[in-house]
Swiss-Prot record:
GO biological process assignments: symbiont-mediated suppression of host innate immune response; symbiont-mediated suppression of host type I interferon-mediated signaling pathway; type II interferon-mediated signaling pathway
Signal peptide extent: 1-13
GO molecular function ontology, one term from the record: cytokine receptor activity
Organismal lineage: Viruses, Varidnaviria, Bamfordvirae, Nucleocytoviricota, Pokkesviricetes
Gene designation per UniProt: OPG193
Coarse class of the protein's main subcellular location: secreted
Quaternary structure note: Homodimer. Interacts with host IFNG.
Protein name: Soluble interferon gamma receptor OPG193
Function: Counteracts the antiviral effects of host IFN-gamma. Acts as a soluble IFN-gamma receptor and thus inhibits the interaction between host IFN-gamma and its receptor.
A Pfam family assignment: CR4_N
């Protein structure tokens, strides 16, 4: 009778064996599966075009498991199989190059005597203890990112957007120089061209306040000129004597008018 009870319990457990949830996610080619289900499972993977299944884990409970070493880093699909006794279930993935998400770049600002350097470090994959930049590598789907940086100067509420040219990039990151002595904050985002359509999150914002006392003001259109004029008028009033103020105020007025005219001409050219 005892053997019959044991067999009955085993039979009941096999009936209730079931994967109740499953999730695959790969960020920077760090690939993991997360699943829930009763009991212990053998987990294997098969890439498209290969007949055999690769054993990844044996007799493991529900949880999160690293499978980075098993899917091919290309566009072929693959399957993940869970087995417990006679119960089997296969989960399909369209391919690592399609599914992988790319994390944000890392931004650094460094001040030099006559300029500031913006350095954007590529997101990287981890292979053991090595950090490998994700940039035009065949084993990482030939992914490379084109970056957009948002600069915020001084007390401005609106950022200035700048697209980084790939000519400014190497296999490790992108570097551009610029000049300002107002506080500047920068954040960057990367995106691929083509059908993969990868877009990273925005990086953490970094800020730098230069030491030199030179004043700048971002002008993107003629609507920004009055703000520039008001700001420079305050600088003239605070930093120069009355005799100099008169000359500099006239010069500021004529310069502001010239800038407004120039920007208006550019706008007409743009829409002509």
């Amino acid at each position: 009778m005892r053997y019959i009870i044991i067999l009955a319990v085993l039979f009941i457990n096999s009936i209730h064996a079931k994967i109740t949830s499953y999730k695959f996610e790969s960020v920077n080619f760090d690939s993991k599966i997360e699943w829930t289900g009763d009991g212990l499972y053998n987990i294997s993977l098969k890439n498209y075009g290969i007949k055999t299944w690769q054993t990844m884990y044996t007799n493991v409970p529900e949880g999160t498991y690293d499978i980075s070493a098993f899917p091919k880093n290309d566009f072929v699909s693959f399957w993940v199989k869970f087995e417990q006794g006679d119960y089997k279930v296969e989960e399909y993935c369209t391919g690592l190059c399609v599914e992988v998400k790319i994390g944000p770049p890392t931004v650094t600002l460094t001040e030099y005597d006559d300029h500031i350097n913006l350095y954007i470090e590529h997101p990287y994959a981890t292979r053991g203890s090595k950090k490998i930049p994700i940039y035009k590598r065949g084993d990482m789907c030939d992914i490379y990112l084109l970056y957009t940086a948002n600069f915020t100067f001084g007390d401005s509420e609106e950022p200035v957007t700048y697209d980084i040219d790939d000519y400014d990039c190497t296999s490790t990151g992108c570097s551009i120089d610029f000049a300002t002595t107002e506080k500047v904050c920068v954040t960057a985002q990367g995106a691929t061209e083509g059908f993969l359509e990868k877009i990273t999150p925005w990086s953490s914002e970094v800020c730098l306040t230069p030491k030199k006392n030179v004043y700048t003001c971002a002008i993107r259109s003629k609507e920004d000129v009055p703000n520039f004029k008001d700001k420079m008028a305050r600088v003239i009033k605070r930093k120069f004597n009355k005799q100099s103020q008169s000359y500099l105020t006239k010069f500021l007025g004529s310069t502001s008018n010239d800038v407004t005219t120039f920007l208006s001409m550019l706008n007409l050219t743009k829409y002509s």
